[in-house]
Amino acid sequence: NLVLENLEKLGGFECKSYTILNAPKLKRIDEKLYIGVAASKVGSINAQEILNGLSSITYVGKDLRIDCSGIESFEPLRNLSFVGGDLIFDIGGSERNNLQSFTGFESLTTIGGRLIWGTGVSSAGSVSTYTSFSNIQSFQGFNNLSSIGGFRMSINYGDFSKFTSFAGLENLRQIKGDFTIEIEDSFWGLSDISALTNLETVEGSEFKIKGCYKLEDFTPLKQALTSYQGTFSTYSNG
């Protein structure tokens, strides 16, 4: 266990070996915050208990990376308003797929880096169909997010059939980098991106949507594409 009862600020924090964190006054982390990364190598870690101990966090200066295998709720991050680097969700194979939504990120307005989902690459038959995100249906919880530095979804395995829409991103106006979705899995449910109707700009050189076999309507991207100057590509979609 790690007790930091009076600490209000940290340079950076990489948590791989603690089961419980108590930091009730910690509001600011100027560098990276990694939670549960490489948890498979540290069997005793409880990523949810670590999140519970960070309930006062409002600011992460660089990357925030969360291994979601043991996460059941993001509610402890309800005060987080700014991430300066990437916000990375490492999605692993899991039979404990109790995570239902992104509730807890309602205060987050800006991600300076990319918003990233990723499963990594697996050998055939080596990973469970169920993942820590198998019950996620949309982006509900990110309802006040207005600006991100980039967007990347890279899915190589797992059941994401319940994830059907981008609902929750209605206030997203600006993506300062690339927008890429690359799906190499048949259990992918995304069919509705109407929440991106208000997206005004994508400033990166790549705008790509691949593997969304249920997605047929791209008109919600009309406003963003009007001003887009890079390469827009879609293939293996609906």
Go through each PLM region and give its residues.
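Concave beta-strand-loop units of leucine-rich repeat
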Residues: N1-K25, D30-G53, Y59-Q137, G141-E216, ...
